[in-house]
Amino acid sequence: MKQKKKKFIPIKVKNLIEWNEPNGEGCIVSDKITVEGYKVGYMVRENPMSEYPDSGWRFMAGNEDDKYMSDPNHHNIFALNTICNYDPDIIPYLHAKTGSAFIRIDSQNFEKDDESKPIFIEKQDR
């Protein structure tokens, strides 16, 4: 079965960040953000995969269920700077330690996720 080509939301990529961490600037991003147009609602920094240029960051809208997330066709690898262009609200949090997780609490702000609050889910204004 031939895989259907994804239609990523077109954006003009500007250099918004300088990333000099040793593991690289790759990140895994849900299609809810890059294809369906949601803002980042949940972000977690895992241990980077050492065999790849991986920052450890994983970005989701926050409305993905387990079935959606278990399908690798629903996420892609991007450069951090590219995802910052999709959602610049994430920039202040990018140097957080491995193990950090943040949820969106309103249109522009995140806070550390202690699993006590719902994720604020919103579409990008494009």
Across the structure, where does each feature detected by a protein language model lie?
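Acidic, aromatic-enriched beta-alpha/helix-loop junctions
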Residues: 43-94
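Short, compact, well-ordered microdomains
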Residues: 77-123
